[in-house]
Amino acid sequence: MKAILSRAPLAVLAAALALPLAENSALAQAPTGPQGGAPPPAQQQQNPDSQKPPTTAQKPPQADVTIAVEVPIVTLEVVATTQHGDIIPGLKKENFRVLDEGVPQTITNFSPTDAPITMVLLLEFSSRGYGGFFAYLGRFWSTALFPTLQQKDWVALETFDMRTRIEVDFTQNKDEVMQGINHLYFPGFSESNVFDALLETVDRLKDVKGKKSIVLLASGIDTFSKHTLDQTMKQLRQSDVTIFCIGLGRAYRNFADMNGGMGSIRELNYLQAENQLKTFSQETGGFAWFPQFTGEMPEVFQSVAAFLRHQYSLSYSPTSGAKDGKFHKIKVELVAPDGAPLTVQDQKGKKQKYQVYAREGYQAPKGGVGD
């Protein structure tokens, strides 16, 4: 699947509903918005003078008798693009149909694309030989990704080798994150435990409300994680975090070739690593990019920004109860007001195919006694 890098402006028509596409949508910068939304839970001690992170929702006063009914909620982050990669903006709640195991669901919550973003930049930074190279590529965040973020958005920076480190905790100051990237000089260990890093990061995000994503910049190679790929995927399916992957194996191999030294890098199974990155993104509703040259990085990050800025957040409570411990397949469709499939046309009236990006399913919890 190719990267979303199209620049051509199009128009979208659904029955009598006009949904104009954002011009240069994959590369457009989002306007700076006002301060909004509560920040995500802090991972480290924050400056007491800075804006405080939110606490969990306050509990209501306890009555004499309380009956608690746990209702499972499934949250989806959805992006829709044309076949040429143009983002389809302006969609409303009634333009989405969600099928859970083929059964239509009622969407209970809907957030448009201007909702605040909570994002973790997760960077592989090992001494295997390419950690510094990856950190160098991470500097493209300043010129390509950060300008598209709004003041209300929250960003954190994490790195990983054999363990995961929080370099910059959640902040709305993007310069602080950029300084954290610039201060990455000498990688420590040679391991790259990407499975563990992903699961630790997802766990930190579990209490964050709203749109939340991980942008993973890595080779995709896992060395000595405590978790297997199957265990990792099972937990990712239970989360509501969208993962966007930028696989850097090809870029590093080309960089090393041009500089006369590959060494043991040729023996590494980059094909398997890329397949793992594709799986992370595809199953969580994200996308994976695999640039071959460093010159492609700004455009790739602009595409990442387009996805992040144009996500729709949908929630529903499965009609089945979804506490059977099984994997449930999800399909998200775009529909016109009359329930027919959404029709997309360009400015010349030519019908366009489109793609909906959303997680493919979720791992339902296992109901216990009394559920």
Region spans (language model):
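N-terminal secretory signal peptides that target proteins for export/translocation
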Residues: 1-7
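Intrinsically disordered, low-complexity segments enriched in Ser/Pro/Gly/Ala and basic residues
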Residues: 5, 21-24, 49
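Bacterial N-terminal signal peptides
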Residues: 11-23
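Scaffold/interface architecture of coatomer-like assemblies
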Residues: 27-371
